[in-house]
């Protein structure tokens, strides 16, 4: 029930108070929610960038749909999906996973071979569409975490 209450509180903010700043602790929780988001094949095919620097936000404003929001918000969080799956990216994710879990590299070899067979054969547009969907899942969980913390978002 708390989740529904938090989501009911959430809305797309149209203007921010530039004098209010979100704490590092809250930003870290929002990013952690994105990191823990489920993704197809466990690849998490995106990077999350946090922009707090005002001059950098001013540069980003030029391409924004609501430039005032980007200029005045405390932080800009960018979800940058990969352009496509590659053998190197798949290997990097699973090498990291095995290293973090103290397992031998190659333990997931048959699984990663299957992923490569599927993803590398797809056209770039299909890869990117799949990656975008995985990125939106992480974005959704980050927005949910922001709502739980009562941090406004757009």
Place the predicted regions along the sequence by residue.
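Acidic, surface-exposed loops and disordered segments
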Residues: 1-154
């Amino acid at each position: 029930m708390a989740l529904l209450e938090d989501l009911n509180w959430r809305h797309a903010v149209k203007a921010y108070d530039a004098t209010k700043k979100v704490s590092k602790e809250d930003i870290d929780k929002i990013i952690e929610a994105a990191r823990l988001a489920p993704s197809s094949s466990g690849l998490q095919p995106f990077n999350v960038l946090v922009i707090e620097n005002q001059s950098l936000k001013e540069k980003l404003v030029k391409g924004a749909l609501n430039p005032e929001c980007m200029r005045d918000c405390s932080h800009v969080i960018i979800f940058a999906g990969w352009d496509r799956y590659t053998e190197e990216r798949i290997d990097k994710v699973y090498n990291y996973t095995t290293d973090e879990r103290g397992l031998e590299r190659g333990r997931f070899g048959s699984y990663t071979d299957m992923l490569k067979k599927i993803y590398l054969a797809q056209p770039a547009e299909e890869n990117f569409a799949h990656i975008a969907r995985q990125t939106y899942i992480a974005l959704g969980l980050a927005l949910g975490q922001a709502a739980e913390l009562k941090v406004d978002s757009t």
